[in-house]
Protein backbone atom coordinates (compact mmCIF):
# COMPACT_ATOMS: atom_id res chain seq x y z
CA UNK A 1 0.00 0.00 0.00
CA UNK A 2 1.34 3.42 -0.98
CA UNK A 3 1.79 5.94 1.83
CA UNK A 4 0.64 9.46 0.97
CA UNK A 5 2.72 12.02 2.82
CA UNK A 6 2.07 15.73 3.39
CA UNK A 7 4.88 18.17 4.10
CA UNK A 8 4.47 21.49 5.88
CA UNK A 9 7.06 24.19 5.31
CA UNK A 10 7.45 22.72 1.83
CA UNK A 11 9.23 25.77 0.45
CA UNK A 12 11.95 25.90 3.09
CA UNK A 13 15.39 24.33 2.96
CA UNK A 14 14.27 21.25 4.82
CA UNK A 15 10.90 21.07 3.09
CA UNK A 16 12.48 20.85 -0.35
CA UNK A 17 14.81 18.10 0.82
CA UNK A 18 11.82 16.20 2.21
CA UNK A 19 10.01 16.44 -1.12
CA UNK A 20 13.10 15.08 -2.85
CA UNK A 21 13.45 12.25 -0.31
CA UNK A 22 9.80 11.29 -0.76
CA UNK A 23 10.21 11.22 -4.53
CA UNK A 24 13.19 8.86 -4.17
CA UNK A 25 11.52 6.44 -1.72
CA UNK A 26 9.62 3.40 -2.93
CA UNK A 27 6.10 3.06 -1.54
CA UNK A 28 5.79 6.75 -0.62
CA UNK A 29 4.26 9.60 -2.63
CA UNK A 30 3.71 13.28 -1.96
CA UNK A 31 0.01 13.83 -1.32
CA UNK A 32 0.02 17.46 -0.22
CA UNK A 33 2.42 20.34 0.45
CA UNK A 34 1.83 23.36 2.64
CA UNK A 35 3.28 26.80 3.23
CA UNK A 36 2.33 29.69 5.51
CA UNK A 37 -0.41 32.14 4.60
CA UNK A 38 0.82 34.89 2.30
CA UNK A 39 3.79 32.90 1.02
CA UNK A 40 4.85 33.74 -2.52
CA UNK A 41 5.12 29.99 -3.17
CA UNK A 42 1.39 29.29 -2.84
CA UNK A 43 0.09 27.70 -6.02
CA UNK A 44 3.52 26.48 -7.16
CA UNK A 45 4.06 22.83 -8.03
CA UNK A 46 5.87 21.20 -5.12
CA UNK A 47 7.93 18.92 -7.35
CA UNK A 48 9.15 21.72 -9.56
CA UNK A 49 10.04 23.75 -6.47
CA UNK A 50 12.19 20.88 -5.18
CA UNK A 51 13.74 20.23 -8.62
CA UNK A 52 12.29 16.72 -8.92
CA UNK A 53 9.94 17.46 -11.81
CA UNK A 54 6.22 18.17 -12.05
CA UNK A 55 4.25 16.24 -9.40
CA UNK A 56 0.83 17.82 -9.80
CA UNK A 57 0.77 18.81 -6.11
CA UNK A 58 0.15 22.51 -5.62
CA UNK A 59 1.40 24.22 -2.49
CA UNK A 60 -1.46 25.53 -0.36
CA UNK A 61 -1.93 27.07 3.08
CA UNK A 62 -5.08 25.13 4.04
CA UNK A 63 -4.66 21.69 5.62
CA UNK A 64 -8.41 21.10 5.76
CA UNK A 65 -8.80 21.48 2.00
CA UNK A 66 -6.29 18.65 1.45
CA UNK A 67 -7.23 16.34 4.31
CA UNK A 68 -8.32 13.55 1.96
CA UNK A 69 -5.06 13.70 -0.01
CA UNK A 70 -2.64 12.46 2.65
CA UNK A 71 -2.27 9.81 5.34
CA UNK A 72 0.61 11.23 7.39
CA UNK A 73 2.08 14.69 8.01
CA UNK A 74 5.80 15.52 8.27
CA UNK A 75 6.54 18.75 10.14
CA UNK A 76 9.92 20.48 10.45
CA UNK A 77 8.72 24.02 11.17
CA UNK A 78 8.43 25.95 14.45
CA UNK A 79 6.77 24.96 17.72
CA UNK A 80 3.70 27.20 17.46
CA UNK A 81 2.94 26.01 13.93
CA UNK A 82 3.64 22.37 14.73
CA UNK A 83 1.22 22.41 17.66
CA UNK A 84 -1.53 23.81 15.43
CA UNK A 85 -0.85 21.08 12.87
CA UNK A 86 -0.82 18.52 15.70
CA UNK A 87 -4.33 19.53 16.77
CA UNK A 88 -5.52 19.11 13.18
CA UNK A 89 -3.94 15.66 12.89
CA UNK A 90 -5.49 14.50 16.15
CA UNK A 91 -8.92 15.66 14.97
CA UNK A 92 -8.47 13.89 11.62
CA UNK A 93 -6.64 10.88 13.11
CA UNK A 94 -3.54 11.26 10.96
CA UNK A 95 -0.10 10.23 12.18
CA UNK A 96 2.77 12.74 12.38
CA UNK A 97 6.53 12.81 12.08
CA UNK A 98 7.80 15.81 14.04
CA UNK A 99 11.31 17.16 13.53
CA UNK A 100 10.61 20.62 14.95
CA UNK A 101 12.85 21.64 17.87
CA UNK A 102 12.59 24.33 20.54
CA UNK A 103 9.46 23.12 22.35
CA UNK A 104 8.93 24.15 25.96
CA UNK A 105 7.64 21.67 28.54
CA UNK A 106 4.02 22.54 27.77
CA UNK A 107 4.54 21.87 24.07
CA UNK A 108 6.18 18.52 24.78
CA UNK A 109 3.27 17.62 27.07
CA UNK A 110 0.80 18.33 24.26
CA UNK A 111 2.72 16.01 21.95
CA UNK A 112 2.70 13.32 24.63
CA UNK A 113 -1.04 13.74 25.10
CA UNK A 114 -1.70 13.62 21.35
CA UNK A 115 0.11 10.28 21.18
CA UNK A 116 -2.79 8.76 23.10
CA UNK A 117 -4.82 9.21 19.91
CA UNK A 118 -2.37 9.06 16.97
CA UNK A 119 1.06 7.70 16.14
CA UNK A 120 3.91 10.21 16.44
CA UNK A 121 7.63 9.94 15.79
CA UNK A 122 9.15 12.92 17.61
CA UNK A 123 12.91 13.31 17.37
CA UNK A 124 15.44 16.10 17.64
CA UNK A 125 17.47 14.57 14.82
CA UNK A 126 16.50 12.05 12.13
CA UNK A 127 20.03 11.21 11.02
CA UNK A 128 20.87 7.53 11.42
CA UNK A 129 24.40 8.51 12.45
CA UNK A 130 23.28 10.90 15.17
CA UNK A 131 20.96 8.32 16.67
CA UNK A 132 23.82 5.84 16.74
CA UNK A 133 25.88 8.53 18.51
CA UNK A 134 23.17 8.75 21.20
CA UNK A 135 23.81 5.08 22.04
CA UNK A 136 27.59 5.58 22.02
CA UNK A 137 27.20 8.50 24.43
CA UNK A 138 25.25 6.32 26.84
CA UNK A 139 28.02 3.73 26.80
CA UNK A 140 30.76 6.34 27.25
CA UNK A 141 28.86 8.00 30.08
CA UNK A 142 28.45 4.67 31.85
CA UNK A 143 32.19 4.03 31.76
CA UNK A 144 33.64 7.55 32.14
CA UNK A 145 30.87 9.93 33.12
CA UNK A 146 31.41 10.03 36.87
CA UNK A 147 35.16 10.56 36.52
CA UNK A 148 35.52 13.24 33.85
CA UNK A 149 34.27 16.61 32.62
CA UNK A 150 31.54 16.44 29.97
CA UNK A 151 31.15 19.22 27.40
CA UNK A 152 28.86 19.38 24.34
CA UNK A 153 29.81 21.70 21.47
CA UNK A 154 27.41 22.30 18.58
CA UNK A 155 27.51 24.41 15.42
CA UNK A 156 24.74 25.35 12.98
CA UNK A 157 23.98 27.85 10.23
CA UNK A 158 23.28 31.49 10.99
CA UNK A 159 19.52 31.12 10.42
CA UNK A 160 18.86 28.62 13.22
CA UNK A 161 16.60 30.27 15.80
CA UNK A 162 17.01 28.02 18.88
CA UNK A 163 20.08 27.28 20.98
CA UNK A 164 21.44 24.93 22.07
CA UNK A 165 20.23 22.73 19.24
CA UNK A 166 17.63 20.10 19.96
CA UNK A 167 20.21 17.47 19.09
CA UNK A 168 22.71 18.86 21.61
CA UNK A 169 20.01 18.86 24.29
CA UNK A 170 19.11 15.27 23.42
CA UNK A 171 22.76 14.32 23.74
CA UNK A 172 22.82 15.92 27.16
CA UNK A 173 19.63 14.14 28.17
CA UNK A 174 20.99 10.74 27.13
CA UNK A 175 24.14 11.37 29.17
CA UNK A 176 22.29 12.76 32.18
CA UNK A 177 19.81 9.88 32.26
CA UNK A 178 22.64 7.35 32.13
CA UNK A 179 24.34 9.10 35.08
CA UNK A 180 21.14 9.57 37.09
CA UNK A 181 21.30 13.35 36.77
CA UNK A 182 18.69 15.96 35.86
CA UNK A 183 19.85 18.01 32.89
CA UNK A 184 17.84 21.02 34.08
CA UNK A 185 19.91 21.00 37.27
CA UNK A 186 23.30 19.92 35.94
CA UNK A 187 23.30 21.53 32.49
CA UNK A 188 25.37 24.73 32.14
CA UNK A 189 24.35 26.74 29.09
CA UNK A 190 26.23 30.01 29.62
CA UNK A 191 29.60 30.94 31.10
CA UNK A 192 30.46 34.60 31.47
CA UNK A 193 32.58 36.59 33.88
CA UNK A 194 33.89 35.09 37.11
CA UNK A 195 32.20 31.70 37.07
CA UNK A 196 34.31 29.93 39.66
CA UNK A 197 35.78 26.48 39.16
CA UNK A 198 33.95 23.94 37.09
CA UNK A 199 31.88 21.46 39.08
CA UNK A 200 32.57 17.83 38.24
CA UNK A 201 28.89 16.95 37.74
CA UNK A 202 28.21 19.76 35.25
CA UNK A 203 27.27 19.01 31.66
CA UNK A 204 28.43 22.04 29.70
CA UNK A 205 27.10 23.38 26.40
CA UNK A 206 28.73 25.66 23.84
CA UNK A 207 26.97 27.03 20.75
CA UNK A 208 28.33 28.29 17.43
CA UNK A 209 26.17 29.98 14.77
CA UNK A 210 27.92 30.72 11.48
CA UNK A 211 27.53 30.66 7.73
CA UNK A 212 25.81 27.61 6.21
CA UNK A 213 26.87 24.90 8.67
CA UNK A 214 24.29 22.10 8.36
CA UNK A 215 24.98 20.63 11.78
CA UNK A 216 28.03 19.58 13.80
CA UNK A 217 28.11 18.11 17.29
CA UNK A 218 31.04 17.03 19.44
CA UNK A 219 30.92 15.63 22.97
CA UNK A 220 34.01 15.63 25.17
CA UNK A 221 34.61 13.20 28.01
CA UNK A 222 37.72 14.90 29.38
CA UNK A 223 39.89 13.57 32.20
CA UNK A 224 43.37 14.60 33.31
CA UNK A 225 45.76 13.27 30.68
CA UNK A 226 43.22 12.03 28.14
CA UNK A 227 40.04 13.01 26.32
CA UNK A 228 37.51 10.96 24.39
CA UNK A 229 35.55 12.83 21.72
CA UNK A 230 32.41 11.50 20.05
CA UNK A 231 31.45 13.63 17.07
CA UNK A 232 29.01 13.81 14.18
CA UNK A 233 29.04 16.15 11.18
CA UNK A 234 26.17 16.48 8.73
CA UNK A 235 27.09 17.81 5.30
CA UNK A 236 23.60 17.71 3.76
CA UNK A 237 20.06 18.06 5.05
CA UNK A 238 19.20 15.05 2.92
CA UNK A 239 20.40 12.79 5.73
CA UNK A 240 17.65 14.22 7.96
CA UNK A 241 15.06 14.07 5.18
CA UNK A 242 15.75 10.43 4.37
CA UNK A 243 15.55 9.56 8.05
CA UNK A 244 12.21 11.33 8.39
CA UNK A 245 10.74 9.49 5.41
CA UNK A 246 12.07 6.22 6.81
CA UNK A 247 10.31 7.08 10.08
CA UNK A 248 7.09 7.84 8.18
CA UNK A 249 7.09 4.41 6.52
CA UNK A 250 7.71 2.75 9.88
CA UNK A 251 5.00 4.80 11.61
CA UNK A 252 2.40 3.90 8.98
CA UNK A 253 2.01 0.56 10.75
CA UNK A 254 1.24 2.15 14.13
CA UNK A 255 -2.19 3.22 15.36
CA UNK A 256 -1.00 5.41 18.22
CA UNK A 257 1.90 6.04 20.57
CA UNK A 258 4.94 8.29 20.96
CA UNK A 259 8.14 7.03 19.36
CA UNK A 260 11.59 8.31 18.46
CA UNK A 261 14.32 7.22 16.07
CA UNK A 262 15.61 4.70 18.59
CA UNK A 263 12.36 2.82 18.00
CA UNK A 264 12.45 3.29 14.23
CA UNK A 265 16.03 2.00 13.98
CA UNK A 266 15.61 -0.63 16.73
CA UNK A 267 18.69 0.72 18.50
CA UNK A 268 17.63 -0.60 21.89
CA UNK A 269 19.02 -3.94 20.74
CA UNK A 270 22.58 -2.56 20.77
Swiss-Prot record:
Sites where the protein binds NAD(+): 9-14, 35, 99-101, 123-126
Role, per record: Catalyzes the conversion of 4-hydroxy-tetrahydrodipicolinate (HTPA) to tetrahydrodipicolinate.
Name used for this protein in its record: 4-hydroxy-tetrahydrodipicolinate reductase
Keywords carried by this UniProt record: Amino-acid biosynthesis, Cytoplasm, Diaminopimelate biosynthesis, Lysine biosynthesis, NAD, NADP, Oxidoreductase
Keyword Amino-acid biosynthesis (UniProt): yes
EC number annotated for this UniProt entry: 1.17.1.8
GO molecular function: 4-hydroxy-tetrahydrodipicolinate reductase; NAD binding; NADP binding; oxidoreductase activity, acting on CH or CH2 groups, NAD or NADP as acceptor
Entries under PANTHER family matching the protein: 4-HYDROXY-TETRAHYDRODIPICOLINATE REDUCTASE 1, CHLOROPLASTIC-RELATED, DIHYDRODIPICOLINATE REDUCTASE
Alphabetized InterPro entries for the sequence: DapB_C, DapB_N, DapB_N_CS, DHDPR_bac, NAD(P)-bd_dom_sf
Binding site for (S)-2,3,4,5-tetrahydrodipicolinate: 157, 166-167
Gene Ontology annotations of biological process type: diaminopimelate biosynthetic process; lysine biosynthetic process via diaminopimelate
Organism annotation: Pasteurella multocida (strain Pm70)
Binding site for NADP(+): 36
CDD domains, alphabetized: DHDPR_N
Reaction it catalyzes: (S)-2,3,4,5-tetrahydrodipicolinate + NAD(+) + H2O = (2S,4S)-4-hydroxy-2,3,4,5-tetrahydrodipicolinate + NADH + H(+); (S)-2,3,4,5-tetrahydrodipicolinate + NADP(+) + H2O = (2S,4S)-4-hydroxy-2,3,4,5-tetrahydrodipicolinate + NADPH + H(+)
Domain of life: Bacteria
Pathway membership: Amino-acid biosynthesis; L-lysine biosynthesis via DAP pathway; (S)-tetrahydrodipicolinate from L-aspartate: step 4/4
Location, primary (coarse class): cytoplasm
Transcription in keyword set: no
Active site (UniProt): 156 (proton donor/acceptor), 160 (proton donor)
Similarity section: Belongs to the DapB family.
Cell location: Cytoplasm
Entry-linked Gene3D superfamilies: Dihydrodipicolinate Reductase, domain 2, NAD(P)-binding Rossmann-like Domain
GO terms under cellular component: cytosol
Amino acid sequence: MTLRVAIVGAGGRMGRQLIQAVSETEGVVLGAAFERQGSSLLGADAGELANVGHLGVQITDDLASQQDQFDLLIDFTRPEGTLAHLAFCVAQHKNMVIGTTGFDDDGKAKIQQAADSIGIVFASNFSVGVNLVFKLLEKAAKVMGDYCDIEIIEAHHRHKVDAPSGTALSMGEHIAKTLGRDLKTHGVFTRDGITGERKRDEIGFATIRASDVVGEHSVWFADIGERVEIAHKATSRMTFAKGAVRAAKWLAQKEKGLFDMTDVLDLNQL
